[in-house]
């Protein structure tokens, strides 16, 4: 028997072994892909609470702003129905950090500070770096509408960031992105809008 004939005879014996192995590897790769990409990302964007009038530049929160911010951690825990916040970002001013602090304390998170130049491209970084996670971003009247529009494609729906409104952008993969507005503040004033 020639050497080529022996090789041909050996190949059919490998097929019953290799074919199931390839099927298992392909299925495992598919499950891994689905597990890492087919998740829903939730980005909650809100403006810092009310700031004091003085000092100009980088003021602390006003007493009303402190009261509004104080309940944010519990409000988000209720809104997420016992879920968790995975990442927390805030602008690098005192008013943004003071608004984020109750959220950080409630969920045991560090506050990742965003310098002025870091807001550009933030939406795409949130989508790619935090897929399948829940992220809270505390911004400014000038940054919240743009970030929401970039995340949700809803440019006309958020003309300016309002006090006591959390913009919830739900990004399912696959599926259509949705935008919700939640009001927060004193007890009894929370409500959802679509």
Regions found by a protein language model. Name each.
Residues 138-140:
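Short beta-strand segments
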